[in-house]
């Protein structure tokens, strides 16, 4: 999104964060481990925006991590994003974490894997083409052994879960 100023919130995994895309540059803050995202995200968000002298009026949108991930965590980022967006009349953009990870890899075929805990992973297979990336099958929640790659070769895995 060149030229856009976007605040992004992510709390669907253990590593919560907020990021600010401002005039083509990204700055971020990571939530401290061991503390609930509901306690740490807003102070980090305020710190990040204050550091850059940015107010909500200068933003074009607010994005949030729409999962997959922990239900409580999803509600934290979604609720904060929606509350802020309504207050300042900004659009809200949901972002799939698996898709966002795949987009950063720079390979044509990417299997994104997130640890869902309790011996399971969230998985999504993406193919990058001229029009962007396309999900090859439904995102699934499964044991790592049960995750199936599409039949063709050349896949690269990314994420924090075992393949």
Each language-model region and where it sits:
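Residues at secondary-structure transition points
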Residues: 32-40, 71, 75, 79, ...
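Glycine-rich nucleotide phosphate-binding loop and flanking beta-alpha elements
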Residues: 15, 70, 120
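Surface "functional belts" at beta-alpha junctions
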Residues: 1-3, 36, 90-163
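N-terminal beta-alpha supersecondary unit
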Residues: 2-66
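Active-site phosphate/pyrophosphate- and oxyanion-stabilizing loops and adjacent acidic/basic residues
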Residues: 46, 82, 99-100
């Amino acid at each position: 999104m060149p030229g856009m100023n976007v605040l992004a919130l992510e709390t669907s995994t253990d590593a919560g964060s907020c990021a600010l895309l401002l005039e083509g540059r990204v700055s971020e803050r990571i939530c401290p481990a061991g503390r609930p995202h509901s306690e740490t995200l807003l102070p980090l968000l305020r710190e990040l925006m204050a550091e850059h002298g940015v107010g909500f009026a200068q933003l074009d949108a607010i994005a949030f991590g729409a999962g997959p991930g922990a239900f409580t965590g999803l509600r934290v980022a979604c609720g904060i994003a929606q509350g802020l967006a309504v207050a300042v009349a900004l659009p809200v953009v949901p972002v799939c974490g698996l898709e966002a990870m795949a987009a950063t890899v720079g390979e044509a075929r990417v299997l994104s894997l997130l640890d869902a805990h309790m011996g399971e992973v969230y998985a999504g297979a993406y193919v990058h083409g001229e029009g962007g990336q396309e999900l090859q099958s439904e995102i699934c929640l499964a044991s790592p052994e049960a995750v199936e790659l599409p039949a063709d070769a050349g896949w690269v895995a990314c994420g924090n879960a075992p393949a």
